Amino acid sequence: MVSHKVLEFGDDGYKLPAQARAPRSLRKKRIYEKKIPGDDKMCAIDLLATVAGSLLLESKSPVNACLVVQNTVKNEYPADENPVKAVPYSESPSLFDNGKCGFSSVITNPNHLLVGDKVGKEVEGFSSLGVSGDVKPDVVASIGSNSSTEVGACGNGSPNESRDDVNLFSRNDDDENFSGYIRTRMTRPVPRIGDRRIRKILASRHWKGGSKNNTDAKPWYCSKRSYYLHHHQRSYPIKKRKYFDSVYDSNSDDYRLQGKTHKGSRTISSMKSRNASFVSRDHHVKLRIKSFRVPELFVEIPETATVGSLKRMVMEAVTTILGDGLRVGLMVQGKKVRDDGKTLLQTGISEENNHLDSLGFSLEPSLETTPQPLLSSYLSDHACDDVTLCHDNALDSSHEPEPSPADSFGKLGTSDHSRALIPVASAAMLAPRPPNRKFKRTEQQLAAQRRIRRPFSVTEVEALVQAVEKLGTGRWRDVKVRAFEDADHRTYVDLKDKWKTLVHTARISPQQRRGEPVPQELLDRVLKAHAYWSQHLMHQLQTEPPSTQVEAL
């Protein structure tokens, strides 16, 4: 069951209207000030400052000046039709707000009297009326055009201020037809006349203003921007209010500057935003190169040679490799940078990068210095129209060492069965070289050359299949001696791997094959030879004794 409670204030039993509550996060973070014992007592210096301020305002504006407005009081209750009077500000600090002269009104029941305009009578009236500080009559009154009301004229006349928990309001668009006040709280709190209350009043600009007219005194939120920030931050928790305060402090100067210089402030603010978003990249990268990587050198010298001859030979080898041009190579984190048009920042080299030790430099011979027209002139001098390749001698030429450019050109030009194509390797060999360069092919260079991956040609595959058909799959050294004796770049391990690749290629579909195409006739021969020698090996293992099988394994 739900219990309905009726709140009665006064004699009429008026119900408290529903009010919107603040968010739960805001209610949790609300800070309640502890009541300091003795805080209600006013200090002597604070009381003196309050009295001095009130006297200053009273001397500037007549206290007894009253403005009579021909209006009518329309009460919400039809039985109560009593006029309402507003008395001037009195010097009693316990009944009204301290430090300001404003409106003060008392709304009573029909059996009560109104307050007089003298200070003594006012105090007596309040004591005789017996209005308690905890309960007030709940009255909402609007001032119409049928009653006369006396309104005090002291103070700045601000319509939006509140006195004694009564919010006075008015409409600027229709002042003659409507004005009034609204009660928001039913209980009067204990008046705060201690240090904190007085300090807030003394810190306002009303006390610091030096103008003689009260209308010149403007509140601190006269600016639209600061007024918006002041009222907008009330709906946020206390932690977030610090952000609004910092925004107001940082933007106040810019806003005042914008009010004085209209176009200039826009330029300055735009320059500020650009400078905030733009970060200069004029930083320099500092590198320290300890040593260069030189191409590998192979020097062969007898033991009886002198140190000077060794130095001269090394110098000749360096001159031979580098030649007449040098080139610096750059490697970043193990990857060679080939594009010279990239910036250091795009490559990953910057001042903020802590991996500068991963940079590598190397001295390389500048092969690009060789002009391309020399190749065409070399070919035109020998009157060569078609450079051909011989199919019959392809295997024999691969067995021989690398010939000189002139010999290779002569052999290529005297072939009957030819193709009008120039391989890339042949074009590199045909390039002219300096006459003073010495070529010494050592065993180390030949061993390094053998490790270069060179795919098998169709002729080599045919020779391999023919040798395996005669010798079998378990005698790869004999296959090497029989078919590839002069091919130094082909080892018996290469032949064994190639045979396994051929068997796998022959078993898969043509759509799945990769690399250089092999005729289907050769692939069929590979399958037949592989099946024959596999059965022969199994039959041999079954007929031989176990001791022989162990020795064979």
UniProtKB/Swiss-Prot annotation:
Q: One of this protein's Pfam families, by short name?
A: Ubiquitin_TPR1
Where does it reside?
Nucleus
Q: Which UniProt keywords apply?
A: DNA-binding, Nucleus, Transcription, Transcription regulation
Q: In which tissues is it expressed?
A: Expressed ubiquitously. Highest expression in flowers and leaves.
Q: What happens when the gene is disrupted?
A: No visible phenotype, probably due to redundancy.
**What residues does the Ubiquitin-like domain cover?**
285-364
Where are the annotated segments for Disordered?
147-170, 394-413
Statement: the UniProt record of this protein carries the keyword Transcription regulation: yes
Where is the HTH myb-type domain positioned along the sequence?
448-507
Principal place where this protein is found? nucleus
Is DNA-binding among the key words of this record? yes
Q: Name the SMART domains on file.
A: SANT
Q: What is known of its domains?
A: The Myb-extension domain (509-540) is necessary and sufficient for telomere binding.
The UniProt function text for this chain reads: Binds specifically to the plant telomeric double-stranded DNA sequences. At least 2 repeats of telomeric sequences are required for binding. Induces DNA bending.
What is the protein named? Telomere repeat-binding protein 2
